[in-house]
């Protein structure tokens, strides 16, 4: 996978891209990353990339020329996913990350200032994505967040392919509780079932915990999850236990 970032602050990506999983993915040549400072493509003698909005208003708007010119220098195809990071976009999710993990080429357009000239949105972009209902100074941090979520799903990136399948949201539920040594710590014990060696019971316990944890912390996710009859019994029993406490 090739990933390009159009940004005014390419140095922001150095720390994230040169550590941990993203660095290993580059070392394995699974991904190729490239940052492009679209200020270099300004047609203004002062390298200006923004201007006042027509019709008046607060803030500055990114001009179309630098972004269009930068895109022309990239080797794109009809299959290239050009992502505009903006609060108006579709909320980012594990499902979107899974979809993008199969792309051969992704371009992130990371804006700053008040917003983008609408012609960028209309003529260059394939996907508008937001990482939440809040406003950040620029699109760099959302692009980094998305990159991490996407790349770890590409086959060969993680040491254990099962790892991401057990993550929260991978199957529509939150992840089950995790424990490691010591078995007992300051009076707090690891559940006996995890030490039993009975993998069927362990799997059943983990699924039960995922259901309960999702019900407690993210009940909205259960509305989209295909509950089985057994799942419904687990949740009913949990609700009864709550009433007796």
UniProtKB/Swiss-Prot annotation:
Its main location: cytoplasm. It is found in: Cytoplasm. GO terms for biological process: tRNA N1-guanine methylation. InterPro entries: Alpha/beta_knot_MTases, tRNA_m1G_MeTrfase_C_sf, tRNA_m1G_MeTrfase_TrmD, tRNA_m1G_MTases_N, tRNA_MeTrfase_TRMD/TRM10. Its EC number is 2.1.1.228. It catalyses: guanosine(37) in tRNA + S-adenosyl-L-methionine = N(1)-methylguanosine(37) in tRNA + S-adenosyl-L-homocysteine + H(+). GO terms for molecular function: tRNA (guanine(37)-N1)-methyltransferase activity. Belongs to the RNA methyltransferase TrmD family. This is tRNA (guanine-N(1)-)-methyltransferase. The lineage of its organism: Bacteria, Bacillati, Bacillota, Bacilli, Bacillales.
């Amino acid at each position: 996978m090739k990933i390009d970032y159009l940004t005014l602050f390419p140095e922001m990506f150095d720390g994230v891209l040169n550590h941990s999983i993203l660095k290993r993915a580059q070392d394995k040549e699974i991904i190729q990353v490239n940052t492009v400072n679209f200020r270099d493509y300004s047609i203004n003698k002062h390298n200006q990339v923004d201007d006042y909005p027509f019709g008046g208003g607060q803030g500055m708007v990114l001009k179309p020329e630098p972004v269009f010119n930068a895109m022309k220098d990239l080797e794109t195809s009809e299959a290239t996913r050009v992502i505009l990071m903006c609060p108006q976009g579709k909320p980012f999710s594990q499902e979107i990350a899974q979809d993008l993990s199969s792309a051969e080429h992704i371009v992130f357009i990371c804006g700053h200032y008040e917003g983008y000239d609408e012609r960028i949105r209309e003529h260059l972009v394939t996907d508008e994505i937001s990482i939440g209902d809040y406003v950040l100074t620029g699109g760099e941090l959302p692009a980094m967040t998305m990159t991490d979520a996407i790349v770890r799903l590409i086959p060969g990136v993680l040491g254990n392919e099962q790892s991401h399948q057990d993550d929260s949201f991978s199957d529509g539920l939150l992840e089950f509780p995790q424990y490691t040594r010591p078995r007992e710590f300051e009076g707090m014990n690891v559940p006996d079932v995890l030490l039993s060696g009975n993998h069927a019971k362990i799997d059943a316990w983990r699924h039960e915990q995922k259901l309960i944890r999702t019900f407690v912390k993210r009940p909205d996710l259960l509305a989209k999850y295909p509950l089985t009859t057994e799942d419904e019994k687990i949740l009913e029993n949990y609700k009864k236990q709550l009433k007796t406490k």
